[in-house]
Amino acid sequence: MANKLRNYTINFGPQHPAAHGVLRMILELDGEQIVRADPHIGLLHRGTEKLAETKTYLQALPYMDRLDYVSMMVNEQAYCLAVEKLAGIDVPIRAQYIRVMFAEVTRILNHLMGIGSHAFDIGAMTAILYAFRDREELMDLYEAVSGARMHAAYFRPGGVYRDLPGFMPKYESSKFRNAKVLKQLNESREGTMLDFIDAFCERFPKNIDTLETLLTDNRIWKQRTVGIGVVSPERAMQKGFTGVMLRGSGVEWDVRKTQPYEVYDKMDFDIPVGVNGDCYDRYLCRMEEMRQSVRIIKQCADWLRVNPGPVITANHKFAPPKRTEMKTGMEDLIHHFKLFTEGMHVPEGETYTAVEHPKGEFGVYIISDGANKPYRLKIRAPGFAHLQGMDEMAKGHMLADVVAIIGTQDIVFGEVDR
């Protein structure tokens, strides 16, 4: 009598290099074929929502950076828009353009990391090295406006922390760089920040082409991604997928176009949409999204160059007065003191505000009871819904394909576990 083989289970993660953080998955296998994939989450749970409810509206802002720690400023943007909607704050137009520009810089940062690490997980190492070279320059932009390369806390309810600087920090000589390399690195840093952005927008599309040369027609890359993790448009909508996970299946839905916020209605850009709903189509969507982000950044930079103005609301109940005003006006000094000791008071009400995050629809739901801190803060993380589709996407595939599916979902556990 032939022996019957039972399915066996293995642990994938949480210390697996392709688990994108602290993912633990229990995989039930029939030979090498996936029968069931059960993600175990919560290993990075820090109680962000509850922590934010114990802090003032301004103090809660830096928690947003630490949710999806690859797309920092877009998290801040969603939170600021929610507070502004509740408080009825008018954001100066220049601040809106700066926010949109940095939101698109963040989108490129995210997609470079997503595509680079996806390729690296599958076995192509060169892509991530090229991606990090470009990410380095974009993080220099973060550092120039906020002083931090990752957790910027640059956006504020009412605008942004400060205007764009009139210069870019330069690299200094060291024993690791000769004079020729130093000159090349500092070439685009001679002028203002907007000059640096223009130079980046000029050369970055060629760098995207280089990435495409490595992957798009690569036989091994296509074998590992075409037909893997297929999601139909109907199932994508039923599962609550958003962003590239939805557009890759052929559904043209982008919050920037369907429900425009800030100045996206003034921007000229296209929405890339997939056909087959597999890992390969989602990769192509991310590639094209980076090109569209460059278009938006260019439009914002051109507008900002010729339109000076304030970058934060003039209402001192929500934004601090200028330091020059505080030196002469008692009222301004009181406003400043009250704002940073007590915090802003937001009128009673509730709101749900969503933005087109690089990973999907990132939403912030706030209930205010009129106090200086949120009564309830709920975060709708796109990656949470995507991870719930893991079982359906992985079923019937080989064990090695799980890595490709995690990569295409672009999971970051800061936002999933919160």
UniProtKB/Swiss-Prot annotation:
Q: Which InterPro entries match?
A: NADH_Q_OxRdtase_suD (IPR001135), NADH_UbQ_OxRdtase_49kDa_CS (IPR014029), NDH1_su_D/H (IPR022885), NiFe-Hase_large (IPR029014)
Native species of this protein? Neisseria gonorrhoeae (strain ATCC 700825 / FA 1090)
- Subunit: NDH-1 is composed of 14 different subunits. Subunits NuoB, C, D, E, F, and G constitute the peripheral sector of the complex.
**Which Pfam families does the protein's record reference?**
Complex1_49kDa (PF00346)
Q: Which HAMAP family match?
A: NDH1_NuoD
The membrane topology term of the UniProt record is: Peripheral membrane protein
Q: What does this protein do?
A: NDH-1 shuttles electrons from NADH, via FMN and iron-sulfur (Fe-S) centers, to quinones in the respiratory chain. The immediate electron acceptor for the enzyme in this species is believed to be ubiquinone. Couples the redox reaction to proton translocation (for every two electrons transferred, four hydrogen ions are translocated across the cytoplasmic membrane), and thus conserves the redox energy in a proton gradient.
What is the protein name for this chain? NADH-quinone oxidoreductase subunit D
Q: What class of enzyme is it?
A: translocase
What EC number is given for this enzyme? 7.1.1.-
